[in-house]
Amino acid sequence: MTVEIRRPVALVILDGWGINPVCEHNAVCQADTPRLRALLESWPHARIGASGRDVGLPDGQMGNSEVGHLNIGAGRTVYQDLTRISLSIEEDTFFENTELRKVMQQVVESQGKLHLMGLLSDGGVHSHMEHLYALVEMARRAGVEQVCIHAFMDGRDTPPQSGAGYLAQLEDKLQDIGLGRVATVIGRYWAMDRDNRWERVEKAYRAMTEGVGTSFESSAAAIADAYAQGQTDEFVEPRFVGGEKPCTVDDGDGMIFFNFRADRAREITRTFTSSDFSGFSREKTPRLAGYVCLTEYDASFGLPMAFPPETYPELLGEVVSRAGRKQLRIAETEKYAHVTFFFNGGSEEPFDGEDRVLIPSPKEVATYDLKPEMSAPAVTDAMLERVASGRYDLIVLNFANPDMVGHTGVESAAIAAMETVDACVGRVVDAVLNAGGSLLITADHGNCEQMADAKGAPHTAHTSNPVPVILVDPDRTGVKLRNGILADLAPTLLELMGIDKPAAMTGRSLLEPS
């Protein structure tokens, strides 16, 4: 039987919506979500692997938004930068990297300092400590005499007060290698902003360049003082280590940013490298011997990168475009890069026939537990307007709330976030069905389905749980969905659209005829 091709086909991504059989401290379970529950009861659904090897990460590694959207858009399991870089260390090719060797040689020649900055974490979302250790060892081999480490504290992808342990591990490792010192300790809230909150970035920048902030004799003392003041890792106010002689960024120094994820690396990189920077007034602009990004943060930067991006032919967006179909990407600021840049394989450029809608995320609150609805109602309004236009064949929509509010660790707020998203999903489903379309509702990784750890403390990180997928299509009521992985979503969408799957897509459609 020939199935009618419905349009639009909507991919609705509930960011951070995972499956957890335990209801306690589970915002998904605790929330009153009548529309999502009805969808799960009435329409075909299955489970999707969104972590570890299923998305090209190491075994057991939790998924994240960048990895999730990259896998979804590629229609294949994508070998992630974390795995790629770690493998190069194992194989010793890391220590022959051209750009890393070059900046270290420049520092030796200028008799400057080498600054290594990034997220001190083994969370594997933005960085990994093993990469930092390899850089210090490489600097030792290269003859670099001074290595200064600017340690950005995590607390989102790791427990909120795990930073003290990570700093202790780092200090032990530096002792073993015989090179390097911690120069600054800064919460990621300040150093890794991605929403143009330049007042935050300025505090981190001034700590690194001018030594502005409280001085401590050791990294252990710095983090202990932060905890004593009620600051968890993410929010540790910039402080420098070394007493009278802070290890600041000066003329002739070199810098390596060891984060491999792009979105939260752009602003601080722009602050150090842009000649026409306007985010704030820089009191000091060091003339650097070199600046190397571990991966490509933004193609427009034109900066050296140790691991250039890999290309992925025949992405979902490209295949839809070549078929002459129109597509839309829509999200609020916090997830806009994910439905555009990451979904398109790390490319900023839209495909022909691809439109984009950006709804600003709230700026009037410091953390989203204070506004758990975020901009979801406005995103929904914009979505419904575009559905009504009848222009689009494929719409990719992201609701940020379950992830961004989940990261705060405030369970009541995460429950409110899920209830907001439930109402918004209901409006979207009604509009798409009324327009003659169909939907796949899913997530990129888990988060808010676990809001406390085993000890009952707030859980602010992603999870390695599977995520749901629901097919809402009145013409396919007899279809069953099989369990799969994120890479299977693109082939499924193409089948719903009546477009042949390209050879480069190794994912398989989730549709199983009954």
From Swiss-Prot:
Name this protein carries in UniProt: 2,3-bisphosphoglycerate-independent phosphoglycerate mutase
Regions that span the bilayer: none
Family named by the database record: Belongs to the BPG-independent phosphoglycerate mutase family.
Gene Ontology CC annotations of this record: cytosol
Record's keyword annotation contains Acetylation: no
Alphabetic keyword roster: Glycolysis, Isomerase, Manganese, Metal-binding
InterPro entries noted in UniProt: Alkaline_phosphatase_core_sf, BPG-indep_PGM_N, Metalloenzyme, PGAM_B_sf, Pgm_bpd_ind
EC class name: isomerase
Pathway the protein takes part in: Carbohydrate degradation; glycolysis; pyruvate from D-glyceraldehyde 3-phosphate: step 3/5
Residues the entry annotates as binding Mn(2+) 2: D15, S65, D444, H445
Active-site residue list: S65
Pfam families: iPGM_N (PF06415), Metalloenzyme (PF01676)
Cofactor binding description: Binds 2 manganese ions per subunit.
Keyword Signal applies: no
